[in-house]
Amino acid sequence: MTLPEIAVERLSVALGAEVRGLDLAVLDADGVAMVRDLLLEHLVVFFPDQHLAGDDHVALGRKFGELEIHPNLPSPEGGPREIVELRASFGGTADEWHTDVTFSARPPIMSILNHVETPEVGGDTMWSSQYAV
């Protein structure tokens, strides 16, 4: 497959890029390799305007390897076990500094977040590069 022309905008010196022009719902092996390369280069990669349902989200994750079931957080009722839903209206928040399952003997290479709605106040998500410290 010929990869689409994408736009990559670096967001800071230490980490982060925004990628446009790539549809994550139909990613083939070449696209997966491109995303992996972008992740290794930028450490955090944002893909705005993606609309992945739960099963599509899981299918995307599986293209990068075996998925982990989060050991401490519940999955949405009736949804895929690989997905954790943090919804403030249900009491779910992650409003303190944390890392995603790095305590595991074999921590996952990445986390895939699907940000659906941002509150008018708060709701900020920040990333930190441990390479840069």
Q: What feature does the model see in each segment?
A:
Residues 2-133:
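Non-heme Fe(II) oxygenase catalytic core, chiefly the N-lobe of the double-stranded beta-helix
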